[in-house]
Regions:
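Conserved AMP-binding/adenylation subdomain of ANL enzymes
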Residues: 2-23, 30-110, 119
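Active-site-adjacent beta-strand anchor residues
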Residues: 27, 52-53, 124, 148
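AMP-binding (ANL) adenylation modules
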Residues: 28-32, 76, 150, 163-164
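Conserved AMP-binding/adenylate-forming
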Residues: 71, 107-184
């Protein structure tokens, strides 16, 4: 029996609500361990609704209509989001708009809604490394992406940042209870 599965929900690594009103967006294969834990199991544990993407072609439209409170994305998804934003707002123009306080607030709000992340309380990446520069880029848009690390062998969540610390550069946090980490 993997005690990681038993201890993780008590630590609430995604900081989801216990009110049953959480909203999750499912698009990874259902046998993917991150999909199982971050979406399915967390929803069953804390309550909420799981919405599924209809197809790869409707992914953005589906995510935009769902506006989940918890979103897990592999780094490639965030790269595609970033490329989409930069195709409409080249970096120089985006920097200029973000430097104007009122415009910056409105732009961040609109972009988060377009991305489907306007209601997200937990925005997580994992399954592959995400460049710190990309996380900083998103942070400048008001989108704080938490880095996670785990593997199938320990039921997905191996490490997490403690308490209210949701972002620390180049860190995936401390080992979960009952998880031993050895670096050779």
């Amino acid at each position: 029996e993997n005690t990681e599965c038993l201890t993780t929900p008590e630590h609430n690594p995604l900081r989801v609500d216990f009110n049953g009103k959480n909203s999750f967006f499912s698009y990874l294969p259902l046998n993917h361990i991150a999909e199982r834990i971050v979406v399915e199991w967390t929803c069953f544990r804390y309550g909420g609704t799981i919405s599924f993407t209809e197809s790869i072609e409707t992914f953005a439209q589906n995510l935009g209509s769902v506006q989940p409170t918890v979103f897990f994305g592999v780094p490639r998804i965030y790269t595609k989001f970033q490329m989409g934003i930069l195709s409409k707002f080249p970096q120089e123009k985006l920097n200029k708009l973000l430097s104007i306080p009122i415009v910056s607030s409105l732009l961040k709000m609109v972009l988060k809604k377009k991305l489907g992340l306007s209601k997200a309380k937990a925005i997580v990446t994992g399954a592959a490394p995400m460049q710190e520069s990309q996380r900083v880029w998103y942070r400048n848009l008001g989108v704080n992406i938490t880095n996670g690390y785990g593997m199938t062998e320990n039921c997905a969540i191996c490490t997490q940042l403690p308490g209210e610390i949701t972002d620390k550069p180049d860190s995936v946090g401390k080992a979960q209870p009952e998880v031993d980490i050895k670096i050779d």
